[in-house]
Amino acid sequence: MSWLSLTFRIGSDYVDLVGDRLLERGALSVDVHDAGEGTSQEQPLFGEPGAPLDQFWQQAEVTVLLEENANIDEIIQGVAEVIGLPALPEYQLAQVMEQDWVRLTQAQFEPIRISSRLWVVPSWHEPPDPAAISLRLDPGLAFGTGSHPTTRLCLTWLDQFLQPGDSVLDYGCGSGILAIAALKFGADRVTGMDIDPNAITASLDNARNNFCDPDRLLFTTVLPPLVEDDRASAEWAPVTIVVANILANPLIMLAPVLMKALQPGGRIVLSGILETQADEVLQVYSEWFDMHIAAKEQGWVLLAGQKSGGGFA
């Protein structure tokens, strides 16, 4: 079995109209992305939370998946009519062959070496180093497989600085990778928090796959004092380490919350921050922490700091 793939470029103003016309004509799927992707002309479509939303690309590349017997001439003419041209000036047509898509997807994910003693290993691979710590993690609904620089930065920091007996809050836990790693590195208790229920589901699945002790690892969508469960509330005593790998704007807004979650003298680790955003985040957190840039990778930074002594006002 095979399909046809039709690719062409149009102005972004026509994307919705063209997409509707293609689906009406029997398209199986319509994929739209920035025609300048990967070049100096690439334009962001969405900013991070708190950023302006009026960011759009000017040229869109559209890829349509069609049945093998689709009437290509009729479909191309329909697109040309929508954009007001007698014909599409340029397009590419290709055949898409049936493949083992699961195996093809799995082949894209190899074990990732984070440090001399830590690997992130998909479930369909054998651990490359039986003597090392292997986090069993499959790509899924939540962010965090170890492939992104910000995740690697956080894992490397935890590997170097977490001490047995530490207590950890992973704020914005995603897949649970940082929380699970903290437990494997010897943390006494770990709490992973995320506002996305899908992230909690993924984290719980990954915790089970890594044989984590449920009495030492808690995942929740709500921060105390909203959590009324006694066990959850007990786990939310101030911790010795807070790690948050999210984005710069949410981190800025969350600074007072994360400050209260730490014991005096506790350490905070922040990532998901571009080098160009580091100074702004440092300025905000310096009100409560002795902050510095701890590491950089591919334009991303890891900020780390220690909380001053005193109360939790």
From Swiss-Prot:
It catalyses: L-lysyl-[protein] + 3 S-adenosyl-L-methionine = N(6),N(6),N(6)-trimethyl-L-lysyl-[protein] + 3 S-adenosyl-L-homocysteine + 3 H(+). S-adenosyl-L-methionine binds at residues 151, 172, 194, 245. GO terms for biological process: methylation. InterPro entries: Ribosomal_L11_MeTrfase_PrmA, Ribosomal_PrmA_MeTrfase, SAM-dependent_MTases_sf. Coiled coil: none annotated. Its EC number is 2.1.1.-. Methylates ribosomal protein L11. This is Ribosomal protein L11 methyltransferase. The gene is prmA.
